């Protein structure tokens, strides 16, 4: 009955022809989703001949199934702008929480891509501003604090944001161009879903397919924060310095997976260079200290070696390919939060 309350203001009690039952209009897409029916037109055709579907919708054998265009018009005119599906989801979630079926202390999140119903050949190229990264304002403040601490001048604010060229679907402009593997490219959506350890879905968000999981995280977490989670378990797509810092600062434990160190085969790996917090330097395998030089706008401190020492180093060929024999190691100013995540990964089984 709560659905009638949610849609009450979209119906007139004393004008017009008798309307379709709003509960039935909500149930129809559920049939389409549960049974993987490709289109609303085919869903309505199946409802006409399937007695189980009719019973679920409250239709007798003599009742006429609604026309597929009738469903589309009702949805777009009455429900689309109201966020009806979101309201129904929230209401049912509240019932589950009150019944004690959900344990929000440990929340698992993951993202997947859903192919859009859009022709890959129908698009325009346009220039758009690059999306600001999560916690970019806080990062900018701490970058300048770090530079001042090291005797460097603060960076000037960026006057003009970077732009990039991207494909915009003329069929479905809200979708995004997604690179699926090495060769497949499609217009798609990125769906982020959170669930508890029993598998109950707690929240979701949908973004354009070209939005990275880490950029979609803030919208999803905003829905999870009222549940007061103690642990957030996620895959490597969410393993970034900003997300690690954000969760730890909120006293939420991030449980993130092992990620293979990047680097060229046969070359020294980042783990071979040890950061010395006390002296703020990086020690190489041959015990040379790489000293601090600058902090970049992206939030990375640069530590550089002495080329004169490196020129005679026995590990030079597997250490760096730079022409001046200088090794450069970068370390994010929030790297310590990722290191805490590594400690957590080894603690919890």
Predicted segments with their positions:
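Short amphipathic alpha-helical interface patches used for protein-protein assembly/oligomerization
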Residues: 53-57
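Basic, short loop/linker segments at the boundary and entry of helix-turn-helix/winged-helix-like folds
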Residues: 1-30, 35-36, 332-338
